[in-house]
């Protein structure tokens, strides 16, 4: 069985409030935030930044990033989406009712994996480099907004994605704590780590 239309009236109103014509510049920004290239580039840049900044925990943090994305994206796409089976707004609503400006296949809509992955990156990045936290979460929120703006997700999809990505990151951080330490490096003050660093 394919995805079914499982949205609420309130969520549809919220969707239409975000899925508006913001003009060429807003469209361009949303398309960049929604692109796979932006996600890949952002993840790689964060991995490099943590590797360079945190000599004391670089292996654990980079491993946590990779594991968080593996859980967030893999379990989200292979388990959660088929389990929920919710249709994207571009397919659920009548033709012409959605301003659809980004490609999206007719597959499960909840959770938004873009939102999940970016919130997973944001949490691991914040643990490894707390000063980056506000920027990372601002980017994650921007990506979540963009998925509704371009017409491919419901607001509930990106909220669920944020929650799932956060949980995936917490699981990844807990898992890498089990890895053996690779020698001693600078303390938290020198490495810029917070108290929750792995």
Listing of model-derived features with the role each one plays in the protein:
Residues 1-42, 76-107, 191-198:
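N-terminal transmembrane-helix/juxtamembrane module of multi-pass inner/ER membrane proteins
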Residues 32-36, 57-70, 159-162:
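Loop-to-helix transition at the N-terminal end of transmembrane alpha-helices
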Residues 36-40, 59-63, 132-137, 156:
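Short, aromatic-rich membrane-interface segments at the entry and exit
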Residues 46, 71, 75-80, 168-179:
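Alpha-helical membrane-inserting segments
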Residues 54, 79, 83-88, 175-184:
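Membrane-interfacial segments
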Residues 58-127, 132:
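Membrane-interface loops
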Residues 98-198:
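Membrane-embedded catalytic cores of phosphoryl/pyrophosphoryl-handling enzymes
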């Amino acid at each position: 069985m394919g995805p079914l239309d499982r949205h609420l009236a309130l969520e549809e109103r919220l969707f239409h409030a975000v899925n508006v014509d913001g003009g060429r510049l807003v469209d361009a920004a949303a398309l960049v935030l929604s692109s796979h290239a932006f996600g890949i580039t952002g993840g790689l840049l964060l991995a490099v930044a943590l590797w360079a900044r945190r000599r004391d925990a670089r292996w654990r943090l980079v491993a946590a990033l990779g594991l968080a994305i593996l859980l967030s994206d893999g379990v989200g796409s292979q388990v959660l989406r088929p389990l929920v089976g919710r249709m994207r707004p571009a397919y659920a609503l009548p033709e012409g009712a959605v301003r659809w400006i980004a490609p999206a296949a007719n597959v499960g809509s909840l959770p938004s994996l873009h939102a999940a992955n970016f919130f997973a990156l944001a949490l691991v990045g914040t643990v490894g480099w707390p000063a980056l936290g506000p920027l990372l979460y601002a980017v994650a929120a921007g990506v979540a907004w963009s998925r509704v703006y371009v017409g491919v997700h419901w607001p509930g999809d990106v909220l669920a994605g944020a929650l799932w990505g956060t949980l995936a990151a917490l699981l990844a951080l807990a898992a890498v704590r089990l890895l053996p330490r690779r020698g001693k490096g600078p303390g938290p003050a020198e490495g810029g780590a917070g108290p929750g660093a792995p």
